[in-house]
From Swiss-Prot:
Localisation per UniProt entry: Secreted
A GO cellular component entry from the record: extracellular region
Tissue spec: Coelomic liquid (at protein level). Expressed in large fat cells in contact with coelomic cavities, in intestinal epithelia and at the epidermis level.
Organism encoding this protein: Theromyzon tessulatum
Protein role: Has bacteriostatic activity against M.luteus. No activity toward E.coli and F.oxysporum.
Lineage: Eukaryota, Metazoa, Spiralia, Lophotrochozoa, Annelida
UniProt main location, coarse: secreted
Protein name per the record: Theromyzin
Amino acid sequence: MHAKIILALFLGMTAFLAVQADHHHDHGHDDHEHEELTLEKIKEKIKDYADKTPVDQLTERVQAGRDYLLGKGARPSHLPARVDRHLSKLTAAEKQELADYLLTFLH
């Protein structure tokens, strides 16, 4: 149960990113849809989130985030489906890069 709470908190950040991207780009600008979030912007937001995460919770949150990025963990039902849509736009290499980036917060 504790792991589900941590996963939900970590993925809340993912949902926030998705909502921000949708809010910025869902104004009839479909031609710019590919510009929703760059890897660098995602990394900046992940860093901000990780910096605010209590050290004793960081390991579990990083693992939950890696599992979700690498397709080993499902999106919790309370998160909007658009989170999956945003992740689906990333290549496997980009998802792996973000998953590896998450590990840097454990050192």
